[in-house]
Amino acid sequence: EAIAQSSGVNAEAAGYLAQVKARANMEGKDVSTIASELQRLGKQAFIEECWKERLREFPLEMKIWDDCVRTGKFPQISATNKGEVQFVDLIGAKNGSGATFKATDLYWPIPVNEIQRNPNLTQNEGYSAK
């Protein structure tokens, strides 16, 4: 993803992703075939393919939230089309429990000692100021 973000979709970026995809290759394709297919993708489609692969590779690693915050996108997995994922804007998206993400969900609490040192600071919404 980083290579594609900075240099566009090229052989290096496609090669790395192809190696990962080839390990669980269900279609019997070799790395060079997968890399060739990936190189034909546009930049955004390639980046989203990287995100999809992270979802498949690290489902229980709790990495998804960091990716959502970093990209501003949330993966919506289709309930009807197996394996289909769409990336929608994080703010306004609904999670699996039906809660809607708000901008304030992206804030961390301000440490209490910082608030004590600076009375002009107020705690971020959703956190109690002690």
Please describe what each predicted stretch is:
Residues 1-20:
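C-terminal substrate/ligand-recognition segments
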Residues 27-31:
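Boundary/linker segments of alpha-helical solenoid repeat arrays
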Residues 21, 35-130:
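Long, intrinsically disordered, low-complexity segments
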